[in-house]
Amino acid sequence: MTEPFEGRVALVTGAGRGIGRAVALELSAGGAQVALLARSLSQLDEAAEAVRAHGGNAVVLQADVGDPTAVAEAAAQAEKELGPVDILINNAATVQPMGPTVTAPSAAWASAFAVNVDAPFHFAQAVLPSMLDRGWGRIVNVSSGIAAHPGAMVGMNAYAATKSALEAHTVNLAAELAGSGVTVNVYRPGSVDTAMQGWIRSQPPEEIGAVLHEHFRVSYEEGSLITPKHSARSMLAQLLRDETGEIWTVGDA
């Protein structure tokens, strides 16, 4: 029986841990060769070893997605080592700055857009030419439920703004590429038990806002968070469909 991603090359950003790592492992289990990209080399090496331990093929790309030059170089390296990218999962993200907007550093705000919005754009630019030449490609931009309800989590203005912008970019790009064989979709992964969630819970309530801190604390203590593997499988169950410009959620699969 042929695996669903047999013969495909996938590039996953934010692949060192959490959802990105889980997606990379599931793609590999489905037959894909995977390029793992993140900032932490130690996390990337561990993720790559996990892929190889199950018979998969992985290459490690250490890069800061907020740097357009690094993005272009990483995408080129992925193609050099594995071949043209068929599947792009833009998962890397930052939740900072958090807390009152009036005290948010301008540099941190700009960095949030560089990582959460600009990087997916630059990665798409890098891989689209070969996808369009071959008439097949899959791009998934990982968003958040905050884009559906931007006012729901006070204290996360930058995250709400960037994820909303990412979804608009995704849907518009999908319309631009309609009929090309390349699909572009949004994935809202649900509330997942990740290091990012743990970091938020570790922050002083007075710095990020007591209500926001309580939201994340209660979600964790009530056991309502899902595993990265659960979320990854939900995403990939929808990946090979021909629909484009959609907003997937963890419950759609």
Residue ranges and their predicted role:
Residues 9, 16-17:
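Conserved glycine-rich cofactor-binding loop
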Residues 42, 62-73, 106:
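The beta1-alpha1 cofactor-binding region of Rossmann-like NAD(H)/NADP(H)-dependent oxidoreductases
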